[in-house]
């Protein structure tokens, strides 16, 4: 992979997501079919208002969404996909191993393992301090 420093402004050029649903802050490594990105988790996240006010924990499905968005940055930054959208079509074999809380730096890693037409399958994992927080297999459909 190639070390890069793609900031949130550049990420928003690829992804249609915006606050409060943009869950990727920076891309640090990128290759043809692989990406590593960062989500800095803060107490100011909207979801912490209800999950849970006395014990804030990032919802697992939002960790998977952050991984999907990282993979989307990779796919939508390719010139041939400019102006298209990536639709999250499914997830399999998802495991949550560690709670993600305010102050954590969530490292998002996604690798495309299979493509067939507009459908792609990605192996993804999220870590905090080098420890696995979540992993799973994500399916995408490239559209529009």
Curated annotation (Swiss-Prot):
CDD domains: FabZ (cd01288). GO terms for molecular function: (3R)-hydroxyacyl-[acyl-carrier-protein] dehydratase activity. Its EC number is 4.2.1.59. One of its GO terms (biological process) is fatty acid biosynthetic process. It is found in: Cytoplasm. Keywords: Cytoplasm, Lipid A biosynthesis, Lipid biosynthesis, Lipid metabolism, Lyase. One of its GO terms (cellular component) is cytoplasm. Its main location: cytoplasm. The active site is at residue 51. InterPro entries: FabA_FabZ (IPR013114), FabZ (IPR010084), HotDog_dom_sf (IPR029069). It catalyses: a (3R)-hydroxyacyl-[ACP] = a (2E)-enoyl-[ACP] + H2O. Belongs to the thioester dehydratase family. FabZ subfamily. Involved in unsaturated fatty acids biosynthesis. Catalyzes the dehydration of short chain beta-hydroxyacyl-ACPs and long chain saturated and unsaturated beta-hydroxyacyl-ACPs. HAMAP family: FabZ. PANTHER family: 3-HYDROXYACYL-[ACYL-CARRIER-PROTEIN] DEHYDRATASE (PTHR30272:SF1). This is 3-hydroxyacyl-[acyl-carrier-protein] dehydratase FabZ. The lineage of its organism: Bacteria, Bacillati, Bacillota, Bacilli, Lactobacillales. The gene is fabZ.
């Amino acid at each position: 992979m190639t070390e890069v420093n793609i900031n949130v402004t550049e990420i928003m050029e690829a992804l249609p997501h915006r606050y409060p649903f943009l869950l990727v802050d920076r891309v640090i490594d990128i290759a043809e079919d692989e990406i590593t990105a960062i989500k800095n988790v803060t107490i100011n996240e909207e979801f912490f208002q209800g999950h849970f006010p006395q014990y804030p924990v990032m919802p697992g499905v939002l960790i998977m969404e952050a991984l999907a968005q990282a993979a989307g940055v990779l796919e939508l930054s390719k010139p041939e996909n400019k102006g298209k959208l990536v639709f999250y079509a499914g997830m399999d074999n998802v495991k949550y191993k560690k709670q993600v809380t305010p102050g954590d730096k969530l490292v998002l890693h996604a690798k495309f393992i299979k493509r067939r037409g507009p459908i792609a399958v990605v192996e993804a994992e999220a870590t905090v301090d080098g420890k696995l927080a979540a992993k799973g297999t994500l399916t995408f459909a490239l559209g529009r």
